[in-house]
A protein has these predicted regions:
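A beta-rich soluble binding module of mature secreted/lumenal proteins
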Residues: 1-149
Length: 149
């Protein structure tokens, strides 16, 4: 994974429901920016149930420097020290960096992200095949609405 190419804005197309996003109605976006060697700033945002924009800022660190495809992310810091790291594995990445499947080794979490708010039916079907090949059940992924007001 080329971190400079991976940087930027990603729209959440679908995800496995999880406790830390349960307040999100949609418009979920992740933004990544390299900040130092082996570290990436992460800013996630979504439309909250109360109509406000909810934002979470964290940091990702590379744990597999050979591929840059295995990272850990933390959104909890205490006195500048990040705590509670979670796995963030790039399982499938388009050659042109237009879409990505992110998951965890225990299959508990998963996301389909895209550079655009929507994916074609053909690409989505392909990604469902890639999810199966990675050990995921595509049926547990819930579509994320984009463009909500």
């Amino acid at each position: 994974v080329d971190l400079d190419r991976y940087a930027g804005r990603w729209y959440e197309i679908a995800s496995i429901p999880n406790r830390f996003q349960r307040h999100c109605l949609g418009n979920t976006v992740a933004s990544y920016r390299p900040v130092e060697e082996q570290r990436i700033e992460v800013i996630n945002s979504c439309l909250d149930k109360d109509g406000s924009l909810d934002t979470a800022q964290g940091i990702a660190r590379i744990v597999d420097t050979g591929s840059n495809a295995k990272l850990e992310v933390s959104f909890v810091s205490l006195f500048g020290w990040h705590l509670f790291w979670g796995d963030y594995w790039v399982l499938e990445l388009a050659d042109d960096y237009s879409y990505v499947i992110v998951g965890t080794p225990n299959y508990r979490y998963g996301w389909i992200l895209s550079r655009t708010p929507e994916l074609s039916t053909e690409i989505r079907q392909y990604l469902d095949e890639r999810l199966r090949a990675s050990g995921y059940d595509p049926a547990v992924f819930v579509e994320t609405p984009q463009g909500l007001q």
